[in-house]
Amino acid sequence: MAFWVGVSTAADTNCAHEQISIYYKTKHKAKFCVELAINNEERQRGLMFRKEMELSDGMMFVYDRPQSVSFWMKNTSIPLDIIFADEAGKITKIFENARPFSTTSIFGGYDVKYVLEINAGLTKSLGIKPGGLIKHSIILPGN
């Protein structure tokens, strides 16, 4: 799945995964090329054991229903920004600069259906904030 960040057009043309867009600041859009983590095994492994990640890449965790979620950075060597979103794809919380290998729990909220992990610093540099909207075909309008 791809998610355009505005930092590179590589996500648009060379994406081997899925493409996703985030709309923020009214008319601004960022795209990223992201892997989807849909089942329990994929969600548990996440980005663990990865040594690097392209600037416009990421991973989106998809849950069957809105729920309480917490993340940690165990075995994850890439510093990340973690974006939590509700059933409609609306960004409800952002945790910036999650520390590699930390086992400290990062609570995302109670009604989270989607979690997007991107390279640390991108939410701040792009101005992505709670209230923004994640768009992808898996996120149905009106949810």
Regions found by a protein language model. Name each.
Residues 1-6:
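Bacterial N-terminal signal peptides
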Residues 11-143:
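Compact, glycine-rich, soluble single-domain proteins
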